[in-house]
Amino acid sequence: MPGILRAAGDVQRRNISAFRTHDWRDHFERLGKGIIIADTASMMLQHWTTEGEMRLYPTSVPLTDELTKRGYTEVVEKRKNPGWAPTPSMRERNPEWPAYVEGGDPTNPLGTRALYLSWTYYRIHGTQDTRKIGRKSSNGCIGLYNRQIEEVYDRAPIGTQVKLI
């Protein structure tokens, strides 16, 4: 059931889908080039443009808390149809995985777009496996449906501020 918002209340805000929503001002001083907040507990991502327009997306999140970072970062690179190589720790856990998968390959776990964060190996990306959205299923990244990462990709420039919570 959605919480009732009161000016001085301490009620968690929830939208009709039961995602907890955030006010960007609670986390950042200014919109800058835009803001992304990825909430691993509610498995959602909020994106604000420089104009303040906000959109909300369901996500996949890491399998365990140990597999991801929390805190502030930013988008430092964007790629269409990115290639994928497992990290050294992924290769250690899954030696049968390929060393590299070309962009556009239907087995590529990064989907059709990827936002590269300032943290090594961390991405916000699409997925070819739509069953992963709304689940703990990643090795550290935040995943979106391909059509939704394409939307975020088009709206979020390099320099977009990001917070993972």
Named regions from a protein language model:
Residues 1-14:
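N-terminal twin-arginine translocation
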Residues 17-35, 39-40, 55-62, 95-104, ...:
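N-terminal post-signal-peptidase region of extra-cytosolic proteins
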Residues 31, 66-71, 79, 83-165:
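Exported/periplasmic cell-wall-interacting domains
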Residues 53-56, 70:
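Short, mixed charged/polar active-site loops
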